[in-house]
């Protein structure tokens, strides 16, 4: 074992790519009763015949291989060769050589070996060989107790130059066999096969090993003779033994033949009718050529005197097992026949054999494991969310458009769990699991992160910090309003004067700028008037020497005195008395504004008179009266804003925030509603219809329309199969085409085109001297059949909704279809039309459990199907297997001295593979609450892809006198509450509702606090006690949720938990799809104050320490105010 591990670690990458192969063993995630074993196999590339005879399997698995497989087994080797003398070549120009050969580890299982390996926790590892005269293709088989699935994930098997990596894969099946994406549990009872209508039928791959054992109960040839109705003698002296089989790679041993086990009967029938079983072709060997040399008889063993086995010699790629056991002797004479097809046809009595290993499909009755709904929850993890999905049975499919769904599975008894990571929580997480759409509202996760952060910052008082955090972390404006309210209450006495001072400083800054600007503008106006007046009376103000325009008379006189003397009139600096020199000096002179400033001091007052700036300076922002007034006013305004913003979070698709009560409609005219409703949505309409003449007279109206149900009458077409198409050329030099039987003749679907007596020198191999004597057989057949889905053809489809109306004390219900109406004395409810994607004649294909939805095919062949069409290979229930037609043309390709080769120009890709390649072009649909038989399928659409056009008319002709009083009495009591207020997930309130005075009453029960209602549930009450669960979203920490009916509520309410960091469960889409409309009034100012008061009382009654802490903080702010802003002392006069 260790040598193998070391070798696997040291081999190069090229060796690993070429010589390491996978064997995948599928394990259910629960160990069932009985000696259950799991099995697997893998095909290996060819090696020489001499190497094949030296093979010995090795294993690094922690379950040791059964010891009996290490013993040497002897077989009779039969091989053919051409005769040395070919001068007179004919159809008998070849001969056989028999000899004894020894193998170690060949699949020659002993009696009770599999059972002992189960009890001793040992594995059975062996191999089989498919050989021609020069090379062999090994196939490795492994049988291991099911406990290995829990003990290891992988191990390594060595066989010659090859390494096989055994990988244990957990399926989502509890104990069943995975087929068609569903978990099938076969039933061995014969009665289930007789009553097939009560059971499902599935095609399961089976592996069988022949075990030679003498005894009267093991006379297998007698059973074969009886099954085929042949009259063979001396069956008691022929081979004895039985086949031990593992069904679907996961079952307890099945022994064939066994009359009391239907599984054994099917296996035995398959071995007799198709003794070669599945071929051993590797990928790329679907197209191959055989050259048949002819039939010959051999002596088994070689020491006997007479020939007792007929074989067919061939040359080409080996496709079928070369091991068998002779039927003519009870001593167990095993055969190894490379390059020879042994005669396995049991319709003749002599010269035949039985296959040592058989692999093929059998049809079994049984049942499919139930698909359980998924539970999905998420918790915050770093910047994203860590989620987990689990289901009671198994998870057959889980996807998410916004998460990285891993393959990490955990199993606890029958429960499967899958963990995955979502990188973003800024949007809701959508997960599709077991055909259900789950929505995880991540807003609650963000709330939890906020609470966690605030609580961590103030960890000295965790209880108080948490109580404050749950108020601050409510999303939206309400959280900010809460923060503003708490800050104002605690620190308002410090923040109000501080903020006022900051505002005053800003205002004074702008006032000062405005004041200065006004003074400058007035001074400029004075200068302009002085200049205009001087120019009118005395002339120009421009200096004659420097040409500078002066602003005052005093400045002009200074220019006239200084400029002449070559001095600057401002700074008295000497400069040349020229215009250019003086103008250049003015640009650098610092005193040019001297005369302007002197005049400004004369005309502008120095002190600022009373005005805005002075008023701001005199404002008493430290006044205790001002602070108290502002503090009180801010608390009132913020409380109103807080209460108004504490709205519920709307239910999808519609729930409006409303107060207690029900809306009323005066019946002046007929009441008509016309709308479109998605197929997944329920609709509730509730109103009080009032007499337009007398408002005191009213009748309650309650209409409930359930979600759309889809019912289709179908024809069960059966199971659709994927398959591989093989094209084999078989050439023999002598004889008619009917002379030989080829192994593919026993395949379920095959077709052959023969070119008989057409060979010539231009179309012959060099060792075939005959001309016009032989046959070229072109054989098409399907192998590797695998069921992939179940198909149903729609005969008719019906869309319906259940409609219930409570009009006063009258209660009526009816299920209406498309273009149908429900008419009562006062109401008419019609489905005018339905927008749908289903139509008569469509085919529904389910590629897995029907709970996961399916694909719609508009064109599905049901007769004259060609290979490659949708529905090409079908296995109908209780009918023979349906094979496709092969419409392509054959061509025999010939070359001189070359074996002819068949060519086929038709399609070679199966219909299933074509559909997978273009699957996005087909319409798909999801299902929920699906119920099905072979004749009918009923389900609901969880995605709302279909829509109904609904029209409701309520007549205005109502007898208000007799219908105004409703005798039904409803009593309410809040029993339990789960969930959290103010979160995205919401809460669920359980109400005990009693009904008296009438037998049945359709109404709605709502979840409300003192002010508003957050959710409602339409329910049909029966006389006595009823339990009603209401889902709501919203509220605050002081909300006491009560059960309400109209304006009447239960006496006591229950408080929901605070939103926190716990896991957030996914919400099923169907549970959330309801439209509720009762016309209740919206929340007004009175309602807002009720909410504020309820919140304050909730804090006082809840965690009163929080109120103490807030008051301490208020006292601290008052002390801080007295220190920073002391009261001014007034002196006594």
Curated annotation (Swiss-Prot):
GO MF annotation terms: zinc ion binding
Annotated signal sequence range: 1-17
Site (Cleavage): 646-647
GO biological process: fusion of virus membrane with host endosome membrane; signal transduction; symbiont entry into host cell; symbiont-mediated suppression of host innate immune response; symbiont-mediated suppression of host TRAF-mediated signal transduction; virion attachment to host cell
Region (Binding to the ribonucleoprotein): 514-531, 586-603, 590-601, 609-623, 1120-1133
One GO location term (cellular component): host cell Golgi membrane
Alphabetical list of Pfam families matching this protein: Hanta_Gc_C, Hanta_Gc_N, Hanta_Gn-B, Hanta_Gn-H, ITAM_Cys-rich
Glycosylation site residues: 132, 233, 345, 397, 926
Keyword Disulfide bond (UniProt): yes
Disulfide bridges in this chain: 27-149, 61-155, 107-126, 131-136, 173-183, 208-245, 232-349, 374-433, 378-387, 403-422, 450-473, 733-768, 737-775, 749-883, 763-894, 778-902, 804-813, 821-830, 861-865, 968-998, 991-1043, 1008-1013, 1044-1049, 1083-1087
Stretches assigned to the Lumenal side: 18-484, 648-1104
Keywords in alphabetical order: Disulfide bond, Fusion of virus membrane with host endosomal membrane, Fusion of virus membrane with host membrane, Glycoprotein, Host endoplasmic reticulum, Host Golgi apparatus, Host membrane, Host mitochondrion, Host-virus interaction, Inhibition of host innate immune response by virus, Inhibition of host RLR pathway by virus, Inhibition of host TRAFs by virus, Membrane, Metal-binding, Phosphoprotein, Repeat, Signal, Transmembrane, Transmembrane helix, Viral attachment to host cell, Viral immunoevasion, Viral penetration into host cytoplasm, Virion, Virus entry into host cell, Zinc, Zinc-finger
Location of the region described as Fusion loop in the Swiss-Prot/TrEMBL record: 755-775
Residue span of motif YxxL: 613-616
Family: Belongs to the hantavirus envelope glycoprotein family.
Protein name, per record: Envelopment polyprotein
Gene expressing this chain: GP
């Amino acid at each position: 074992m260790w040598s193998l591990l070391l070798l696997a670690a040291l081999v190069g990458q090229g060796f690993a790519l070429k010589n390491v192969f996978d064997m995948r063993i599928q394990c259910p995630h629960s160990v069932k009763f009985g000696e259950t074993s799991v099995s697997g196999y893998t095909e290996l590339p060819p090696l020489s015949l001499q190497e094949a005879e030296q093979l010995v399997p090795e294993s690094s698995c922690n379950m040791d291989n059964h010891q009996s497989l290490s013993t040497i087994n002897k077989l009779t080797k039969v091989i053919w060769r051409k005769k040395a003398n070919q001068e007179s070549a004919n159809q008998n120009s070849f001969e056989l050589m028999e000899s004894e050969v020894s193998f170690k580890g060949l699949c020659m299982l002993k009696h009770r070996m599999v059972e002992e390996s189960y009890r001793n926790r040992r594995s059975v590892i062996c191999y089989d060989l498919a050989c021609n005269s020069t090379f062999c293709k090994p196939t490795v088989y492994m049988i291991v107790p099911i406990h290995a699935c829990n003990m290891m994930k992988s191990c390594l098997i060595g066989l010659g130059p090859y390494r096989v990596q055994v990988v244990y894969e957990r399926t989502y099946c509890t104990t069943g066999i995975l087929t068609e994406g569903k978990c099938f549990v076969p039933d061995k009872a014969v009665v289930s096969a007789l009553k097939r209508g009560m059971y499902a039928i599935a095609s399961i791959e089976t592996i069988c090993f022949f075990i030679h054992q003498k005894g009267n109960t093991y006379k297998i040839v007698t059973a074969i003779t009886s099954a085929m109705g042949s009259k063979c003698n001396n069956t008691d002296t022929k081979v004895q033994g039985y086949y031990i089989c593992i069904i679907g790679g996961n079952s307890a041993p099945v022994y064939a033949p066994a009359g009391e086990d239907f599984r054994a009967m099917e296996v035995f029938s398959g071995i007799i009718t198709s003794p070669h079983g599945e071929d051993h072709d590797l990928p790329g060997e679907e197209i191959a050529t055989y050259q048949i040399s002819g039939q010959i008889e051999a002596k088994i063993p070689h020491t006997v005197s007479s020939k007792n086995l007929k074989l067919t010699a061939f040359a080409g790629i080996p496709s079928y097992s070369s091991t068998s056991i002779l039927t003519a002797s009870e001593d167990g004479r095993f055969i190894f026949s490379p390059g020879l097809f042994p005669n396995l046809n049991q319709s003749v009595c002599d010269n035949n054999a039985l296959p040592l290993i058989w692999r093929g499909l059998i049809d079994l009755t049984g049942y499919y494991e139930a698909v359980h709904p998924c539970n999905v929850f998420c918790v915050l993890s770093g910047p994203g969310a860590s989620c987990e999905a689990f289901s009671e049975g198994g998870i057959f499919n889980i996807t998410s458009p916004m998460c990285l769904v891993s393959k990490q599975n955990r199993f606890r008894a029958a429960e499967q769990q899958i963990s995955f990571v979502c990188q973003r929580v800024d949007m809701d997480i959508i997960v599709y699991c077991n055909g259900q759409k789950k929505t995880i509202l991540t807003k609650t996760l963000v709330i939890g992160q906020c609470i966690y952060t605030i609580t961590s910052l103030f960890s000295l008082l965790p209880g108080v910090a948490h109580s404050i955090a749950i108020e601050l972390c409510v999303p939206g404006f309400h959280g900010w309003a809460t923060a503003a309210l708490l800050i104002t209450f605690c620190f308002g006495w410090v923040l109000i004067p501080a903020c006022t001072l900051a505002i005053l400083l800003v205002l004074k800054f702008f006032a000062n700028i405005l004041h200065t600007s006004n003074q400058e503008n007035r001074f400029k106006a004075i200068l302009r008037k002085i200049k205009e007046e001087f120019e009118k009376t005395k002339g120009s103000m421009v200096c004659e020497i420097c040409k500078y325009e002066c602003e005052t008379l005093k400045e002009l006189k200074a220019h006239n005195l200084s400029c002449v003397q070559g001095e600057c009139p401002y700074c008295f600096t000497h400069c040349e008395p020229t215009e250019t020199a003086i103008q250049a000096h003015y640009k650098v002179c610092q005193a040019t504004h001297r005369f302007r400033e002197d005049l400004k001091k004369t005309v502008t007052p120095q002190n600022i008179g009373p005005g805005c700036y002075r008023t701001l300076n005199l404002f008493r922002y430290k006044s205790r009266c001002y602070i108290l007034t502002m503090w009180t006013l801010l608390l009132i305004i913020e409380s109103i804003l807080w209460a108004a913003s504490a709205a519920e979070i709307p239910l999808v698709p519609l729930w409006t925030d409303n107060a207690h009560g029900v809306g009323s409609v005066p019946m002046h005219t007929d009441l008509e509603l016309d709308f479109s409703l998605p197929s997944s949505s329920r609709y509730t309409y509730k109103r009080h219809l009032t007499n337009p003449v007398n408002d005191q007279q009213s009748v309650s109206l309650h209409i409930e329309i359930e979600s759309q149900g889809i019912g289709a009458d179908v024809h069960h077409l059966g199971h659709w199969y994927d398959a591989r198409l093989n094209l084999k050329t078989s050439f023999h030099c002598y004889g008619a085409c009917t002379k030989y039987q080829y192994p593919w003749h026993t395949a379920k679907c095959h077709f052959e085109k023969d070119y008989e007596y057409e060979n010539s020198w231009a179309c012959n191999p060099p060792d075939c001297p005959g001309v016009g004597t032989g046959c070229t057989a072109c054989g098409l057949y399907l192998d590797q059949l695998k069921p992939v889905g179940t198909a149903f053809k729609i005969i008719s489809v019906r869309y319906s909704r259940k409609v219930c109306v409570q009009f006063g004390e009258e209660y009526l219900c009816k299920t209406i279809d498309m273009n149908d109406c429900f008419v009562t004395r006062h109401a008419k409810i019609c489905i005018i039309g339905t927008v749908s994607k289903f139509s008569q004649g469509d085919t529904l294909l389910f590629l897995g459990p029907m709970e996961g939805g399916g694909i719609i095919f508009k064109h599905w062949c049901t007769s004259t199907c060609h290979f490659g069409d949708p529905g090409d290979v079908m296995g109908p229930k209780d009918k023979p297997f349906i094979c496709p037609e092969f419409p392509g043309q054959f061509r025999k390709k010939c070359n001189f001295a070359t074996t002819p080769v068949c060519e086929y120009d038709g399609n070679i890709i199966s219909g299933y593979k074509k559909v997978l390649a273009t699957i996005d072009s087909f319409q798909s649909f999801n299902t929920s609450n699906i119920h099905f038989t072979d004749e009918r399928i009923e389900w609901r659409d969880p995605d709302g892809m279909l829509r109904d056009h609904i029209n409701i008319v309520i007549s205005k002709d109502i007898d208000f006198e007799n219908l105004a009083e409703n005798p039904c009495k409803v009593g309410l009591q809040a029993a339990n509450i789960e969930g959290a207020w103010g979160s995205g997930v919401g809460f669920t309130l359980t109400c005990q509702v009693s009904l008296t005075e009438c037998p049945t009453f359709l109404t709605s029960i709502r979840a409300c606090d003192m002010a508003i209602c957050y959710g409602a549930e339409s329910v049909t009450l029966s006389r006595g006690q009823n339990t009603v669960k209401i889902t709501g979203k919203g509220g605050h920490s002081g909300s006491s949720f009560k059960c309400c009916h109209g304006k009447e509520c239960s006496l006591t309410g229950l408080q929901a938990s605070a939103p926190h960091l716990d896991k957030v469960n996914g919400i099923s889409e169907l549970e959330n799809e309801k439209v509720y409309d009762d016309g209740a009034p919206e929340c007004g100012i009175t309602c807002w104050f009720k909410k504020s008061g309820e919140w304050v009382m909730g804090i006082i009654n809840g965690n009163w320490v929080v109120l103490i802490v807030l008051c301490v903080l208020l006292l601290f702010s008052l002390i801080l105010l007295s220190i920073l802003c002391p009261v001014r002392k007034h002196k006594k006069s």
